[in-house]
Regions:
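Catalytic cores of nucleic-acid endonucleases
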Residues: 141-203
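Charged, structured surface patches that assemble and position nucleic-acid processing machinery
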Residues: 24-29, 35-40, 58, 62-71, ...
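Short acidic loop-to-beta-strand element that houses the catalytic metal-binding Asp/Glu
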Residues: 122-129
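Interdomain/boundary linker segments immediately adjacent to catalytic/signaling cores
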Residues: 1-93
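Conserved catalytic cores of phosphodiester-cleaving nucleases, focusing on short active-site segments
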Residues: 126, 136-142
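A short acidic/basic microdomain associated with nuclease active sites
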Residues: 98-119
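Charged, terminal alpha-helix-loop-beta segments
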Residues: 82, 102-106, 157-163, 238-248
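Glycine-centered tight beta-turn/hairpin loop motif at sheet-sheet or coil-to-beta transitions
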Residues: 131-133
Length: 250
C-alpha cells in the first residue's frame, strides 16, 4: 500500500539477528492512517476462503459484530487524532499488515475479528505464519509517555507462561495448517512485539531492547519480530493528539 494512501511509511527494516527482525513505522498523516486501518480491518476476503457451511457463517457473524463495534465506538472515518483505544488498534493492524506485505507471511485477521468475545483479555492480539510454517503470536502495546516495548515483551512472556498461545490455537485452527498448530504445542513458534515508540534513535532503541530480560527469553524461539510505531512523535507537521480513553468493554 502506497504511503500517500495509507498515511504511514516504513522508515527502518533491519535484521537484528538471523531470526529477529525490526521494523520502524512512522505515520505521516494520522487521519489517513486511521482511515486505512479501518479499511484494512474491514476487509472480509479471508471469510470467502471457506466453502460455505457453518464456519463461513460463524466467522461472518463475529467479524461483522466486531467491525460494527470498532467503527461505532473506537475508530470513526473522519477521526484525525488518536485515543488510547484507537492507538492499540493502529499498532496491531499496522504491524500485522506490514509483516504480511513485507515478508509475505500468512494473512490472518486481527484476533478480535475471529475470536468469540469473552470478558477480560482472552489472548494475543494478532497472528501470522512464516515461510517455514511456524505460527507467530503478536501483542501490541501503547504507552503515551514512553517506548512501550517493555510492556509488549512482558505481556508476551506472561501469555506464554499462561499458555495463551496454545489456548489461542482453538481460534486460529481453521486458518492455519494442522501441522503448524501441532508444532506450537511442541514449542516451535515465534512472536511479534508491536509497540508505540517515541523519537529515540533506532540504534539506541534496539540496544535497549536487547538488554530487556523478556527479549532475551523470547529470542530463543524460532522467530521474533519487533515493530515500533512512532505514534508518540510530535512536530509542526505531525501533531498526534493522544488522549486518554479507557477501553470500553465489547
Amino acid at each position: 500500500m502506497a504511503e500517500v494512501e495509507c498515511g504511514y511509511k516504513i522508515i527502518e527494516s533491519l535484521e537484528v539477528e538471523p531470526h529477529i527482525r525490526f521494523f520502524r513505522i512512522r505515520p505521516t498523516d494520522i487521519k489517513l492512517t486511521l482511515r486505512s486501518v479501518l479499511e484494512s480491518l474491514s476487509k472480509n476476503s479471508w471469510i470467502m476462503k471457506f466453502d460455505g457451511g457453518f464456519l463461513k457463517d460463524t466467522f461472518s457473524v463475529r467479524f461483522q459484530s466486531t467491525i460494527d463495534h470498532i467503527s461505532s465506538n473506537i475508530i470513526h472515518k473522519e477521526d484525525d487524532s488518536l485515543t488510547s483505544d484507537s492507538a492499540e488498534y493502529v499498532i496491531s493492524e499496522i504491524a500485522r499488515s506490514t509483516i504480511v506485505e513485507q515478508l509475505d507471511y500468512l494473512d490472518i485477521p486481527l484476533g478480535e475479528l475471529i475470536k468469540e468475545q469473552k470478558s477480560g483479555n482472552p489472548g494475543f492480539d494478532f497472528y501470522s505464519m512464516n515461510k517455514s510454517n511456524i505460527i507467530l503470536f503478536g501483542e501490541a502495546k501503547y504507552v503515551a509517555a514512553q517506548n512501550a516495548y517493555g510492556k509488549a515483551l512482558e505481556q508476551i512472556c506472561r501469555f506464554k507462561k499462561d499458555k495463551k498461545d496454545i489456548s489461542d490455537l482453538h481460534d486460529i485452527q481453521n486458518l492455519c495448517p494442522e501441522a503448524s498448530c501441532n508444532e506450537v504445542c511442541k514449542g516451535n513458534k515465534g512472536f511479534i512485539a508491536a509497540f508505540s515508540s517515541k523519537t529515540t534513535a533506532t540504534k539506541i532503541l534496539i540496544h535497549n531492547i536487547k538488554k530487556n530480560v523478556n527479549y532475551k527469553e523470547l529470542s530463543s524461539h524460532k522467530e521474533l519480530i519487533l515493530v515500533a510505531v512512532d505514534i508518540c512523535k510530535k512536530n509542526d507537521n505531525e501533531k498526534l493528539n493522544i488522549q486518554n480513553n479507557k477501553r470500553r468493554e465489547h
